[in-house]
Amino acid sequence: MSFDIAKYPTLALVDSTQELRLLPKESLPKLCDELRRYLLDSVSRSSGHFASGLGTVELTVALHYVYNTPFDQLIWDVGHQAYPHKILTGRRDKIGTIRQKGGLHPFPWRGESEYDVLSVGHSSTSISAGIGIAVAAEKEGKNRRTVCVIGDGAITAGMAFEAMNHAGDIRPDMLVVLNDNEMSISENVGALNNHLAQLLSGKLYSSLREGGKKVFSGVPPIKELLKRTEEHIKGMVVPGTLFEELGFNYIGPVDGHDVLGLITTLKNMRDLKGPQFLHIMTKKGRGYEPAEKDPITFHAVPKFDPSSGCLPKSSGGLPSYSKIFGDWLCETAAKDNKLMAITPAMREGSGMVEFSRKFPDRYFDVAIAEQHAVTFAAGLAIGGYKPIVAIYSTFLQRAYDQVLHDVAIQKLPVLFAIDRAGIVGADGQTHQGAFDLSYLRCIPEMVIMTPSDENECRQMLYTGYHYNDGPSAVRYPRGNAVGVELTPLEKLPIGKGIVKRRGEKLAILNFGTLMPEAAKVAESLNATLVDMRFVKPLDEALILEIAASHEALVTVEENAIMGGAGSGVNEVLMAHRKPVPVLNIGLPDFFIPQGTQEEMRAELGLDAAGMEAKIKAWLA
């Protein structure tokens, strides 16, 4: 998409923050309007995260206008809301390539721009990193300022509160901006509150506040009286007591869509000492009515026609693995009132919408709190219930100690339904489910299952749910199932694989949903094909039988080769002194960038053609 100067005359003047700061203040509302329209035009043509960016247009303009970026360091939490930031920092003409193979990264990325101070993708990291950056800036002594922008969802995570607690202790000079888009602008975010925010952030108030502290520091009763008086004045109109108790100077809430008001407040706060907290209220999807009404649906969008106000409906083809899980969950819950389902803020993505409506008293969205989710499940299991933690592979990493310490060591029957395992596509390095087999396989007595299709997925979920000797995990990918018939649910024998095809000389041991591609290769090379099903415990007897009757083995998985299922096969063969050549096919030892799942599998040699080429080259 070429940039239309006539359509966006003010935005055309801004291809860097230096150019932005040359604009007169009175032109900034027009710039915000054009930036919002350009974002709508661009993302509707290319796909991407949408509603969050619409809500942060004014904030982005104000921050870059007031602060001397990139010298001053601006950190975005998660990064869904950072599209306007990318547009204003030299990437305007490339925004149509975002999330595409070889295009702009879906989130702020240090390797892409000097304006991207912190590479992000997972939530709640900004304040911790910001403290470190602020401390480094203080030691540098160049008066460099640090700003963190965090959303109302991300700030619920424990890591954010750990960071704020530390900031209150060491008191670095930094600003945390809370972008609160959970509700529309309420009555208390009006003229009075905006005026109060500017007053409380102004130099006169700050000077009196700090001067008073020094003067009366030796008179404890008066110092305490002044502190309480200030708290009462603020408490009458602002909800910031928690942040004040953590050691921040709280300002807000203010209208996050008043760009000129934001600039005034930010200028007042820029030179304040110690940790500052600015609470702004925004509306997710601002400026595009369908997104304002349904910000969840418009959070991330495919290509769509903005004039229709609707996203394209799915073709009604095969169900996704998330839906397969959600249907199984509802079916099982209807038969067993001990079932409890937990998700860390991933209801829609994990296929749990229907369950949450049908069984609200057994559905727990714990917000962005993966560690709590796992230990909460442990408590439910101790109480005699059957907890299921539905979580993305990349987010389970955040609760690794809880899986080990709170679940596995105690042999608690918690089922982990691990979605988005393997290559996820457009979200890139931070979201690939590349490591779960490796980091779970080393946990004693953990049962790990890798279904090759949707029927096996259901059977494995059923098997894991009824496994009472410890934790179990079923990992399945993002995307649609393959269309096999669903058979009645039954428990699978733990640790047993099945031979799908008998061939000669070469055997392919497949783990997971690359099975259709592996089957094509087996047919082409007349190889034996085994659906291993279990990564732990491995079917050692079957592995040894196959090794004894074949000249070479190939393992296939959509997980990091290092420490993955193939590594487990190698360990079995070495332990039994079976010197059979083994080729491990899986994800390589680097972080996999964005692109469609099909593009990345082809590039990494995980489609049928790539696998066959690797095997032939290895055998040659």
Curated annotation (Swiss-Prot):
It holds the Pfam family Transketolase_C. GO terms for cellular component: cytosol. One of its GO terms (biological process) is 1-deoxy-D-xylulose 5-phosphate biosynthetic process. It catalyses: D-glyceraldehyde 3-phosphate + pyruvate + H(+) = 1-deoxy-D-xylulose 5-phosphate + CO2. It comes from the Bacteria. Binds 1 Mg(2+) ion per subunit. Binds 1 thiamine pyrophosphate per subunit. Mg(2+) binds at residues 152, 181. Pathway: Metabolic intermediate biosynthesis; 1-deoxy-D-xylulose 5-phosphate biosynthesis; 1-deoxy-D-xylulose 5-phosphate from D-glyceraldehyde 3-phosphate and pyruvate: step 1/1. Its EC number is 2.2.1.7. InterPro entries: Dxylulose-5-P_synthase, THDP-binding, Transketo_C/PFOR_II, Transketolase-like_Pyr-bd, Transketolase_BS, Transketolase_C, Transketolase_CS. Keywords: Isoprene biosynthesis, Magnesium, Metal-binding, Thiamine biosynthesis, Thiamine pyrophosphate, Transferase. GO terms for molecular function: 1-deoxy-D-xylulose-5-phosphate synthase activity; magnesium ion binding; thiamine pyrophosphate binding. HAMAP family: DXP_synth (MF_00315). PANTHER family: 1-D-DEOXYXYLULOSE 5-PHOSPHATE SYNTHASE-RELATED, 1-DEOXY-D-XYLULOSE-5-PHOSPHATE SYNTHASE, CHLOROPLASTIC. Homodimer. Belongs to the transketolase family. DXPS subfamily. This is 1-deoxy-D-xylulose-5-phosphate synthase. The lineage of its organism: Bacteria, Pseudomonadati, Pseudomonadota, Gammaproteobacteria, Enterobacterales.
